[in-house]
Amino acid sequence: MARSNVPKFGNWEAEENVPYTAYFDKARKTRAPGSKIMNPNDPEYNSDSQSQAPPHPPSSRTKPEQVDTVRRSREHMRSREESELKQFGDAGGSSNEAANKRQGRASQNNSYDNKSPLHKNSYDGTGKSRPKPTNLRADESPEKVTVVPKFGDWDENNPSSADGYTHIFNKVREERSSGANVSGSSRTPTHQSSRNPNNTSSCCCFGFGGK
């Protein structure tokens, strides 16, 4: 069944001799029973059709629960990173403190070794090696003995470390020469006393022969 085309309402000035009443009557007769008249040119007739339009697709906005979950996870990750950074900083500070303590103990040990008279290669703090002590003679006091340094014990890269070696060698030579004189004078009475038994024996022999 052909449906009559309802002319646009209010457009009668553009067209002449348009039988609007005939159009409306014909449209009323041809419409199905129980159906509702719809005019696409009139928004009032289309109010029901707009209400029956398919719903819009759901928006892509996240739910509040999801937002809270994401925020809590981010806060947890941030707090975890801060705690790890804090632990790393504490560990670095403790390691630095331990390293400083080790360096302090090492410097104390070095200073003790440098000042210790029993240390093999002890230094006087000026870069010069101390001369090594030698065995003292019984007839000499420790104050009068000049210790002979080991030959070549100075630092070849530091020429100033050999300063005073010539003076030490000359002094040692003088002390040894004076010590030889003292020891020679002390041996003289012993040599004379060793001759006394020969003299007495010769006298006895002469006396015995005279008799």
Curated annotation (Swiss-Prot):
Modified positions (Phosphoserine) in chain numbering: 79, 116, 141, 160
Q: Where is the signal peptide?
A: none
Membrane disposition: Peripheral membrane protein
The residue ranges flagged as biased composition, category Basic and acidic residues, are 62-87
Cellular component aspect of the GO annotation: cytosol; endomembrane system; extrinsic component of plasma membrane; membrane; plasma membrane
Note the PANTHER family from the entry: RPM1-INTERACTING PROTEIN 4, RPM1-INTERACTING PROTEIN 4 (RIN4) FAMILY PROTEIN
The entry's function note states:
Essential regulator of plant defense, which plays a central role in resistance in case of infection by a pathogen. It is a common target for both type III avirulence proteins from P.syringae (AvrB, AvrRpm1 and AvrRpt2) and for the plant Resistance (R) proteins RPM1 and RPS2. In strains carrying the appropriate R gene for avirulence proteins of the pathogen, its association with avirulence proteins triggers a defense system including the hypersensitive response, which limits the spread of disease.
An additional note in the Swiss-Prot or TrEMBL entry is: Cleavage after Gly-152 by AvrRpt2 is critical for the release of RIN4 from the membrane and its subsequent proteasome-dependent elimination.
Protein name, UniProt field:
RPM1-interacting protein 4
This chain is encoded by the gene named RIN4
